[in-house]
From Swiss-Prot:
A single GO cellular-component term on record: cytoplasm
Protein name as it appears in the record: Probable methylthioribulose-1-phosphate dehydratase
Entry-linked NCBIfam families: salvage_mtnB
Binding of Zn(2+), residues: 121, 123, 201
Residues noted as binding substrate in the record, renumbered to the chain: 103
Keyword Cell membrane: no
Enzyme class at the top of the EC tree: lyase
Cofactor binding, per record: Binds 1 zinc ion per subunit.
Molecular function via GO: methylthioribulose 1-phosphate dehydratase activity; zinc ion binding
Known catalytic reactions: 5-(methylsulfanyl)-D-ribulose 1-phosphate = 5-methylsulfanyl-2,3-dioxopentyl phosphate + H2O
Localization: Cytoplasm
EC number: 4.2.1.109
Amino acid sequence: MQNVQQPKKRKLSDEIIAEDEDYQRDPEHPRNLIPEICRLLYSQEAMTGSGGAISMRRNDKIYVAPSGVQKERLQPEDMFVINDDGDTLKLPLNGKICRMSQCTPLFLTIYRLRGSECVIHSHSKRAVLATIISSGNEFRISDLQMIKGIYKRTENRNYRFGEEVVIPIIENTPTDPELQENLVKAMENYPDTCCVLIRRHGLYIWGTTWQQAKLMYECYEYLFDIAIQLKQLGMN
């Protein structure tokens, strides 16, 4: 009887390699999008001095920008690939020596609590100033057209003109992982929010798609800028 050779079962590493090869043909692969958006935010002075990071989910894999690198020079090959448990599936390609972002535990927490597909962390000057001019643990703003670009999670719709957007502010800590406990509390206490501000540090923003996260980031930045200028003018 002739032996029938069984096809070889693909290993997880083979699947990762096959999927990663797609980035050379797919401009919306996380390996391409993360460097592109990092360069954009660098040009807006939100990711200078190696600060900030972006993470995106693609199927069951999570792509994370490395830490301590010049964000405007990131390349597709520089990304870490991890799973939902934080296990490293793939290191940066071409033998590059990079460090996993300190934001990774917070990215994983946001994915777990919100089911997001993209998380942006930046050291935006507008976000920092917004936390300084806000005396309490919240940033509040209303009656501006750009509020309509912010997603209201519990009602599965965007905010309407005239509604008030409330963003929680948590206190900064010596390291990013130490922010996790207060980040979780803020997300639980403010179920509508897609943003958490960190006093004198920056912000985390997330969305169900990378497009939503990026658009909301831009809307939040606009709202922070208006609030800062109103404060300078002595207006509410």
